[in-house]
């Protein structure tokens, strides 16, 4: 489900971070007052897995699902936003909604609704329907800068560690342990999530005083581990070229 307090309307639930833990529940017991976001996986008989999701989603609101009782699901889409306002340091929130869901040009393609069926969980992982249905990238696209890999990540794993021989939290030392772990296990990257830059002003050039970023970059380079810096749209859009060039030089 969307991570929200009970009692929130659908319009209030449209503003969310799309972060939550999975909930295993019978379709008939889904909370009709809450929205579920995609992908949704259904356990059918004899180990069969059914996944519901979308592909090629551009200029159109993503689909939520809402339980209707029994085995019925209803699709719900956010209306077209009218105006945006800041809501906290990182978030822009819709001020109001129109009575339609999208503005489209003549001939615009709409997203695919995908229902994938697999014999088991392994086959589900191998399914490439979303990729097959997506618009191919331009054949002249330069992909040389894309370097895929696994990451060691602190956001979901929690910073507040106990029983360790270093100061836990968002500071230089724990990130060195993450780098050591990544190097030891063939993990290509670590992610430094929210907190490496000072949050109060959403300024990417105000580094958390407990973090020595240049030291960490040098340390990671020595172990052949890359560092990915998380940044909010609100903070990076102020001067993207300056931010990118500044951190690319490290």
Indicate residue ranges for each PLM-predicted region.
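Bulky hydrophobic/aromatic packing residues
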Residues: 96, 100, 109-111, 142, ...
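Substrate-binding cleft of carbohydrate-active enzyme catalytic domains
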Residues: 151-250
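N-terminal accessory beta-strand-rich subdomains and adjacent acidic, glycine-rich linkers
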Residues: 1-138
């Amino acid at each position: 489900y969307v991570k929200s307090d009970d009692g929130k309307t659908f319009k209030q639930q449209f503003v969310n971070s799309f972060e939550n833990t999975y909930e295993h529940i019978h379709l008939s017991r889904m909370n009709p007052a809450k929205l579920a976001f995609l992908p949704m996986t259904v356990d059918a008989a004899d180990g069969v897995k059914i996944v519901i999701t979308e592909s090629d989603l551009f200029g159109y609101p993503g689909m939520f699902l809402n339980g209707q009782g029994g085995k019925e699901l209803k699709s719900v889409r956010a209306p077209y936003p009218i105006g945006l306002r800041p809501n906290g340091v990182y978030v822009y929130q819709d001020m109001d909604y129109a009575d339609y869901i999208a503005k489209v040009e003549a001939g615009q393609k709409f997203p695919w609704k995908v229902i994938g069926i697999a014999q088991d969980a392994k086959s589900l992982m191998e399914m490439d329907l979303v990729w097959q249905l997506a618009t191919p990238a331009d054949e002249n696209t330069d992909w040389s800068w894309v370097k895929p890999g696994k990451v060691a990540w602190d956001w979901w794993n929690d910073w507040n560690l106990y029983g360790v021989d270093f100061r836990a939290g968002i500071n230089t030392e724990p990130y060195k342990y993450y780098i050591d772990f990544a190097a030891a296990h063939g993990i290509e990257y670590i992610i430094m999530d929210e907190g490496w830059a000072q949050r109060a002003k959403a300024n990417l050039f105000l580094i958390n005083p407990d973090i020595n970023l240049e030291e960490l970059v040098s340390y990671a380079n020595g172990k052949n581990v890359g560092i990915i810096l998380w940044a909010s749209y609100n903070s990076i859009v102020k001067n993207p070229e300056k931010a990118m060039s500044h951190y690319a030089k490290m």
